[in-house]
């Protein structure tokens, strides 16, 4: 998503190009864009100039909505990931308030970070060679 955000609005970018730029496998990217397209966060375009594009301005996306589209719940424990806490132990669970507090902090943070902010951290498209900095797919510049 951050890679798409660096382009002009409406610009379609191929997964192959993103794969090469971010040093991620094409198969992995396909697994990521499927749920994003399903909920309308990206739009796919077919054809020789095909690829994916954002459906709104990068400032209008939050990291939270992107993560939830891809991962589902971001709750730290399963019983907080459902609308109704169906855990039979919830009334006796002495750690539930801790997990609920952590869940609240996580959600507040990821909902406060925009795609525009994330994309601003990417190196310029024509910068020096990049390599993956970790399994998250982020990049770092080689010096």
Regions found by a protein language model. Give the residues of each.
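Short amphipathic alpha-helical interface segments
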Residues: 1-9
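A short alpha-helical element within helix-turn-helix/winged-helix DNA-binding domains
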Residues: 12-22
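Alpha-helical residues within the helix-turn-helix
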Residues: 20, 37-38
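Key DNA-contact positions within bacterial/archaeal DNA-binding proteins
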Residues: 27
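Beta-hairpin "wing" of winged helix-turn-helix
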Residues: 40-55
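C-terminal regulatory/oligomerization modules of transcriptional regulators
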Residues: 63, 81-143
């Amino acid at each position: 998503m951050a890679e798409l955000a660096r382009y002009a609005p409406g610009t379609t970018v191929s997964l192959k190009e993103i794969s090469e730029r971010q040093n991620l496998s094409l198969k992995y990217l396909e697994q990521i864009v499927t749920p994003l397209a399903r909920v309308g966060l990206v739009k796919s375009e077919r054809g020789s100039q095909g690829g994916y594009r954002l459906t709104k301005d990068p400032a209008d996306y939050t990291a939270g909505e992107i993560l939830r589209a891809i991962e589902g719940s971001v709750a730290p424990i399963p019983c907080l990931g459902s609308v109704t806490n169906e855990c039979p132990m919830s009334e006796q669970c002495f750690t539930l308030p801790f997990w609920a507090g952590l869940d609240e902090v996580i959600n507040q943070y990821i909902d406060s970070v925009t795609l525009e902010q994330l994309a601003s951290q990417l190196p310029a498209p024509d910068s020096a060679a990049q390599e993956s900095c970790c399994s998250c797919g982020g990049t770092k510049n080689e010096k």
